[in-house]
Amino acid sequence: MLLPRDLLLLPWRRATAAGEAIARRLNHHRAPPFSDPDDDPPFTRLAERPPRAPSKKKKKEEEDQGGRIRPPEPASSDLPFDFRYSYSETDPAWRPIGFREPTRFSPFGPGRLDRPWDGVAAAAARGEGAGAAATSREEVLGEPLAEEEVAQLVERYRHSDCSRQINLGKGGVTHNMIDDIHNHWKRAEAVRIKCLGVPTLDMDNICFHLEDKTGGKVIYRNINILILYRGRNYDPKQRPQIPLMLWKPLAPIYPRLVQNVADGLTFEKTKELRNTGLNSSPLMKLTRNGVYVNVVDRVREAFKTVEVVRLDCSHVGSSDCKKIGVKLRDLVPCVPLLFKDEQIILWRGKVKQENSVSLQFSPEPS
């Protein structure tokens, strides 16, 4: 006979037995614990797979990559001009007085070009290649475009949302840009070039080097926007081979742009002109990476009435200020007197002053 207390305990004992059976089944299926005390039980250890042997395809890609770094034979190009980093912003007549890196380090890479690098340019072999290149350029351009054809191309490529656009910055017409232009010419008849910064001081120079180095023709020019046409008979399969520069070479060291005493002046007069320029109001305020197509004309016009001109180049950068001064020296022409706190002081020069005086007092022809 069961007592009431036993009746109350019987369901509890049955539940305990059932729980023990479930626990035994769970322990049977549970993986044995790891011996390593650093293992975290909530996470499952993945089996370590042995490293796979490199496939033949991957090995071939590595060999090709190694070949691109140091090819078995150096590349050669039939282009008749010397290879430089920038064609429009450097002048072959400028001779450096030193280099910031050894000249044996060619920016084309070790053993990748058959032209020796002298620290400034990779000179081409002198021969009769220039005449042949000019003849081939005329053949590629073909017959001149009609006005209707020019208008159609301009309407297609002149807009700002054009996908065939190349931005030309303070580096000017660079060597690798020539390859970019030919890449666009594979699928487009023309390419839109947007020019900004220091090179816009001389747009004629940019147009000349674009046509001379690529073989195309500028069919549209509006302020700083150019459209470069490839030619009627252009064949992408016969494009010239252009070895690419792998890095930008360090600029050589050139003589000082500003002398302590300007030519034809004394030290006191030079100092007086510098103070006069600093205390005068600026002729123009130039912005960084702006469009400077009208700066040369405005400086020339100002020199008709004043002797010293100041240009405010705040936030332009000291490097760009000196580049602007070099271009204005050759284009105006004038004499840079001072570069201080991103301010450019220009003097019209003694020769120009004497010419203006002689013209003022010269008798009129009878």
Swiss-Prot record:
GO terms for molecular function: RNA binding. Residues 60-71 have a biased composition (Basic and acidic residues). One of its GO terms (cellular component) is ribonucleoprotein complex. Residues 143-241, 263-359 form the CRM domain. The keyword Transit peptide applies. Pfam families: CRS1_YhbY. It comes from the Eukaryota. Residues 24-82 are annotated as: Disordered. SMART domains: CRS1_YhbY (SM01103). GO terms for biological process: Group II intron splicing; mRNA processing. It is found in: Mitochondrion. InterPro entries: CAF1P_plant (IPR044599), RNA-binding_CRM (IPR001890), YhbY-like_sf (IPR035920). Residues 1-14 form a transit peptide. Keywords: Mitochondrion, mRNA processing, mRNA splicing, Repeat, Ribonucleoprotein, RNA-binding, Transit peptide. Part of large ribonucleo-protein complexes that include group IIB introns. May be involved in the splicing of group IIB introns in mitochondria. This is CRS2-associated factor 2, mitochondrial.
